[in-house]
Amino acid sequence: MDDNKRPLYLPFAGPAILEAPLINKGSAFSEEERIFFNLEGLVPYAIETIEEQASRAYDQFRSFNNDLDKHIYLRNIQDTNETLFYRLVQNHISEMMPIIYTPTVGLACERFSKNYRRNRGLFISYPNKDRIDDILNNSTRQKVKIIVVTDGERILGLGDQGIGGMGIPIGKLSLYTSCGGISPAYTLPITLDVGTDNPQLLEDPMYMGWRHPRIGGEEYAEFIEAFMQAVHVRWPDTLIQFEDFAQKNAMPILERYKDRYCCFNDDIQGTAAVTVGSLLAACKAAGTELNKQRIAFLGAGSAGCGIAEAIVAQMVSEGISDEQARSQVCMVDRWGLLLDNMPNLLPFQQKLAQKCADICNWNNFSDNISLLDVVNNAKPTVLIGVSGAPGLFTEEIVRAMHSHCERPIIFPLSNPTSRVEATPKDILHWTSGQALVATGSPFEPVVVDGETYEIAQCNNSFIFPGIGLGVLASGARHVSDAMLMASSRALAECSPLAINGSGPLLPKLEDIHSVSKHIAFAVGKVAIEQGLSLPASDELLMQSIEDNFWKPEYRRYKRTSF
């Protein structure tokens, strides 16, 4: 039976119900509920439907003049009536997703302490390292199935935001629910407060976190270990998503725990999965295959290298050797093209460095080979930006790329909008509308020579909610590389441009529920095939996906005692 049709039995009444966001209905409590739960007089007389409430809330939302105020308003609804919040977002998802997440969430993180109103989630501070289990026990969510956790050190492209980074786990989990149908009762945002190296925060009298330089080394590793163990003991089947950890910690943490617990890093693996899915769709739209592409990256951090490794894996699955695939991927960072003779390459960069012998015949060879040098010599067909530095895809670079590639695939993925490597408008004008463009942040459609081009947002929200739903529905014990690859292929199968030859590269946000279910099925099926979950037929898996897909509808309440 659908949970939304079954009554929910509550052991308390009166103001306590109105203060519980997961069960509060506000003006939608029925006459019977108002009597039995001692609510008469605590809410206005009129009994409203959730759609009537959502209509009023939307009018109020539209009355705010800037996006940060809209964000604060929506968070206030979320903190008072979660069902109404998700109904409102569901009704206006294209308009509200940029408000509840990127790009607005970046500003919300920067002003977190100044705008703080009400607690959501858990803050686990290093001075309390010996009481982590007690802190987890304090959570108002006791059936936690998905955790998003950050330490606030690398928030979007904004750097160290300390506990202000909590805006990211809150926003991500809002998308797990609004896009992937995960019940908000099963979600828990967590910030690990290990100090901050941001001098502005340390000197800000309103900063609410642990006012101390960030810990590191063994202290940091032991704190993360204690946290992971405590979560596993309390909620052994919980999916843990790592979010916005600094490059020096992100990959080591993922490598340490991915085979021990059910976890993944969205910046590395989620970004890689959605990018590969978008590339597969773009290649199909251009009438080619991914293993035939030459790819240049601007940005060789953990996210960029994670994407590159996923691309290499997909190329190999399409029939070429690992060595050949790596030779077709060029990584450029602030020091230029990564080469195998560079002394300070990080471990995850080493396998992606080009061999010096392979580029000895390039023109303009120098110690620091620029992105323009790479474009002129390697002649890439795909250009991906994950640098966090705006404007680096210059007109000269894009035009040079277009001169040897009729339909260049260009993905400036850096967030927020102010950090994008080039705007879609510029890219499409420089290529006479021929480029296939996807961005990390939302952009308005672009008109070139009278033709309108919808800009695909290569946003992780197309991937991670479906992964989470697939893990929950299948009961997977780990998130494997094969499951992530399956999510990429499933996303590509939903591309309007690849399927119909017209429309955007990625689906519209209004179709996100069907996309998430499609991805969840692909992910769950691989988990079953790999023995990471109990055996189940396709029919049972689909039914489990539907059973786990929460809808923002009010339930009837009954009292358990008087």
Curated annotation (Swiss-Prot):
InterPro entries listed in its UniProt record: Aminoacid_DH-like_N_sf, Malic_enzyme_CS, Malic_N_dom, Malic_N_dom_sf, Malic_NAD-bd, Malic_OxRdtase, NAD(P)-bd_dom_sf, NAD_malic_enz_proteobac
Keyword annotations: Metal-binding, NAD, Oxidoreductase
GO terms classed as biological process: malate metabolic process
Cofactor: Mg(2+); Mn(2+)
E.C. number: 1.1.1.38
Manner of cofactor binding, per the entry note: Divalent metal cations. Prefers magnesium or manganese.
Keyword Oxidoreductase recorded: yes
Database matches in CDD domains: NAD_bind_1_malic_enz
One GO CC term on file: cytosol
GO molecular function: malate dehydrogenase (decarboxylating) (NAD+) activity; metal ion binding; NAD binding; oxaloacetate decarboxylase activity
Active-site residues, record numbering mapped to chain: 101 (proton donor), 172 (proton acceptor)
SUPFAM superfamilies (UniProt xref): Aminoacid dehydrogenase-like, N-terminal domain, NAD(P)-binding Rossmann-fold domains
Catalytic reactions on record: (S)-malate + NAD(+) = pyruvate + CO2 + NADH; oxaloacetate + H(+) = pyruvate + CO2
Site feature (Important for activity) residues: 267
Protein residues bound to a divalent metal cation: 243-244, 267
Subunit structure: Homotetramer.
Family: Belongs to the malic enzymes family.
HAMAP family (UniProt xref): NAD_malic_enz (MF_01619)
Name of this protein: NAD-dependent malic enzyme
